[in-house]
Structures are given as C-alpha cells and as structure tokens.
Amino acid sequence: FRIPIIMLIFAHYIKNCAMIKENFIKLYENSFKENWDLPCYTDYGEDTTFTYGQVAEEIAKIHLLFQYCSLRRGDKISIIGKNTSRWCIAYLATVTYGAIVVPILQDFKPNDVHHIVNHSESTFLFTSDNIWENLEEEALSGLRAVFSLTDFRCLHQRDGETVQKFMKNMDAAMKKNFPKGFYKENINYTELSNEKVMLLNYTSGTTGFSKGVMITGNNLAGNVTFGIRTELLKKGEKVLSFLPLAHAYGCAFDFLTATAVGTHVTLLGKTPSPKILMKAFEEVKPNLIITVPLVIEKIYKNVIQPLINKRSMKWALNIPLLDNQIYAQIRKKLIDALGGRFKEVIIGGAAMNPEVTDFFHKIKFPFTIGYGMTECAPLISYAPWNEFIPGSAGKILDIMKVRIDSDDPYNITGEIQVCGENVMKGYYKNEEATREVFTEDGWLKTGDLGTIDANGFIYIRGRSKTMILSSNGQNIFPEEIESKLNNMPFVLESLIIERNKKLVALVYPDYESLDSLGLNTPENLKTVMDENLKNLNKLVGNYEQVSKIQLYPTEFEKTPKKSIKRFLYNSITEE
C-alpha cells in the first residue's frame, strides 16, 4: 500500500495529465510567419544571419528534396555535427515534414555513429564534411544520401539515386513550386499529431550502450510550451547556444524554445572553453544562459576561489556589512563577465557542487538548477532563480507527476519516479529495456535517488546504480564525497570507487596549475594529495572514510551530458 499513500501525499499539487493542446509542428509554422523579418540563427564568428523567413525558405527547399526522393512520414534522418544554423534547419525541416530526426553527438566514435544510423534505419544523413570523411561508407549501406551541413550539397548518393542532379536544379524547383516567390503565406506544415514519435535521441548514458529514446511531439511540446509559459525567452531576445544540440537539454531550450518564440540564436560551433565562452558572452550578451555544472564550476574554481581565498579577502568577509559589499562586487563582476543582460543562469545535466551552489546563493547570483533526463525530453523540475532552494533540483513541473519509492518520501531516500506529458514513449526496438524502465503502473524509473518536500521541490542524493552499501549497512553516495574532494587544491576531477570493501578516490590532478606554480613533481603531488585526503576525511562521515587517493593519468571519459562513465573505472586496480 506504499505507493497509493505516497500519491495522496502529493495530490495537492499534482494536476491531471492531458495531451498538450499546442501542436508541436504548428508552433514553428506560426513562429516563422510572426517573426518573418527577425534574425533567427547566426553562426558565431561569421557575418551571415538567417532571418526567420530565410529559415522557412531553406526548409521549403529541403521539403522539395524529400518529396522528390519520395520520403515517407516516419522515415528517419540522422544529423551529426557541431552547433550551426544549418544543423537547426535540417532538424526543423525533418520534423515539419513528418519524418523522425535522429541527432547524434559529434564526439561519438565512428563505430557508434554507424550503429546509431543503422539501428535507427536512417534514410538520409546530414553531417559535416570532415565527419563524413571518417565514416565508412560500406558500414552505412542503408543510407540513400548524405548532405553537407556547410551548404547542404550532396556528399554521397547510393547507386541509382539522382539526388545530386536534383540539388543542382533546386532553384528551378523552387521557381516551379513558388512562381511568385516564397512568402509566409506559403508555409503550411502538416498538423502531425503530437502523439507521433518525432525524435530518436540516442545516449550512451552510464551503462555503456546506446538506447534510442522515442520522443513524441507531445514530449517536445511539453518542454517548449513550459518555456513559453514561464517566459524563459521572449521575442527579439538573444541566446548563445554552446551545449551540444544533439543533447536533449541544449536542444529543448537554446534551440526549440528559442525558435518557437522569435529569439535570435547565436550558435557557438566550437568547443566551449572558458576563454572562448567569456569572449562570446561579452559579444552576444544573451538574455538567458543554459549551461552545465562543469562550466560554472570551472569559472568558480579559476576566477572566484583564488579571489576569496586571499588572506585579506578572508579577513574582510568576516566583517559585518563589509562582506555584503564585497559579495555585491563579486556578483557584479560575474554578471558582467557573462554578458550582463541575462535574467538567470539555468544549470542542469549533472550534479552541481554544493560548495559552489552555496556561494552563488550567498552572493545572490541569479542562477537556478533544474533536473531532467533524455527520457523526459528532458525537463522534470525547475524553479526560477528567485524561488530556487539551494540543495534542491527545482520544483516538479505542473505537467508532470513525481513520487518517491520510499516509506517516508520527505525524509527517507528512495528512487525518484515520474509520469506526465514529458515522459518518452519507450526505447526504439528494445521492448525489454522499455519494460525494465517503467513500473507496472506506468511510472518512469529515473534511476536517481532522492527525497521531496511538501512544496514539490526535489532533492537528489545520487544514482541508484552508483550507490555503495557500506559494511554496516549505510548508504554511501559517491557523488557527495567527490563534490568535496573536487574543491580541494589541484584536484581537477575525482571518482570514488569501492575496492576490497574500502573507498578509494581516483584523482586526475590539475597539472596545468601545478606547472604554472612549479610544483609538478611526484614529491609535491604526494604531499598535496596526502593533505587533501586528511582534510577530506574530516568532512565526511565515519562510514564514508576514504582509504587512499590514487592518481589517474588522464581526464575521465564522459557521457554526452558530461557525467563520468563510472562503469569504465570500477575495476581499476592499485598503482
């Protein structure tokens, strides 16, 4: 009787689920018409900008290509490449035609790309020239044609296809179909039901093997209309898209929500190092920043921590009234560094370091932390920055339901389970995995462990798959220990593993900082890490004591959302 009791506890804020009334495809038809002359997409560092009208015209050209090739609704089209205007255009051309888009992260290895393209049964592939050069044509025999994300030219066509010939005559085809020119009145996309699958999102997750998440128009509309209702972005505002668009988080808000409301999207198109990002923020001056903890934590560690750790600063921060003035100066400096115009910074995709969260809250920096997963396209919970509770992962959305698999969901950690508008249809061609991830009564098992409060705020403790059970029966969440260790001197990344019933910390040191200070010697490194281990064990419980720190030679391999692929390191032996 546990689950019905839990449901009663949350009945006061859960709404009944019903199909999102706004049609996902029509959101973009309406946006193109209403924002025809406004700037839509700009590739960072380039002069060219597509207006909403020009994007609609490019989509019309691709639709003519699809029609020429007798592409059917429900056929799959893969896209792999960096964030660019044409990436966005290819995505929207696919879904507004009624085909299913299959975005692939550009840092996936060729064998993974082959697997996804083949498993999804993709007909066409849009990609960059250099990525195509590294793929094996013979391994992708199901593809009819491949198109460049640089200029949409045909890079490859299967024997017997005449795609290249049609592409050369595209202007003539446009004149034939739109003899008076292409205008907003010519946009009339098929109103495909929101129930239809429109996206297959493959992710390696933390189990090491990709599953194709079937996302419907309703799932996408749920995320986008939530962004519209809460006014995350408005017509004429600006965003900088630097998270990979093939990942659900960046795609939903930097791209899909932004395009639905008439926002100007600048696509970074390069690796978002802190130096590149700061320059781009200064130039673009975005009205909203969507990011992951890794970016914010690097800014904190490289910019803020050295400042507040100075002896004079520590002294000043202990003086009443003066501390508030200093915090205000730090806040202003940070806001200015990020462009100065944003309403808030939304952080998601992985766990945030509690020390960083507490400091940002203390200086009243406008940030919030959301929670989601690919299977929810991705949003589960969010609260605006002025309502955000430090330590939480936001408040459950009004179009979602949540329950905790626990006898006392307010106080005792249990698995977080959700249902609602954003929850996927299942895994493509994988009924077994679909059955495993849903409960018998239809709730999605997130695999995350946490609690919830009376107002619907979610508090995440860790992953059920990573939790370690101590010898005395205590639950150990390695992420909580790692967050403390990562704040210590010269620790760039860490990973807690269990070895012979003891906890061991794998650490990738900050060699760059060690080199700059002339401290990169085995003796110095051992001294620093011994001190870190001693200080770490003072901060954790008796059952969480770490037996040793073992240095790791390279950065840890990560998933698309920048979580460490833990399964690769569980069997790491002693040095």
Language-model-derived ranges and their functions:
Residues 36-37, 167-202, 209, 232-238:
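Conserved pre-ATP/AMP-binding loop-to-beta segment of ANL
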Residues 51-53, 189, 198-224:
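Conserved AMP-binding A3 loop
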Residues 108, 125, 420, 425-426, ...:
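AMP-binding/adenylate-forming catalytic core of the ANL superfamily
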Residues 396, 403, 410-411, 415-470:
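Conserved ATP-binding/catalytic segment of the ANL
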Residues 69, 96-175, 501:
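Structural core segment of the AMP-binding/adenylate-forming
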Residues 40-84, 88, 92, 109-114, ...:
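Conserved AMP-binding/adenylate-forming core of the ANL superfamily
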Residues 221-238, 245-332, 341, 366:
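Conserved AMP-binding/adenylation subdomain of ANL enzymes
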Residues 27-51, 548:
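AMP-dependent adenylate-forming
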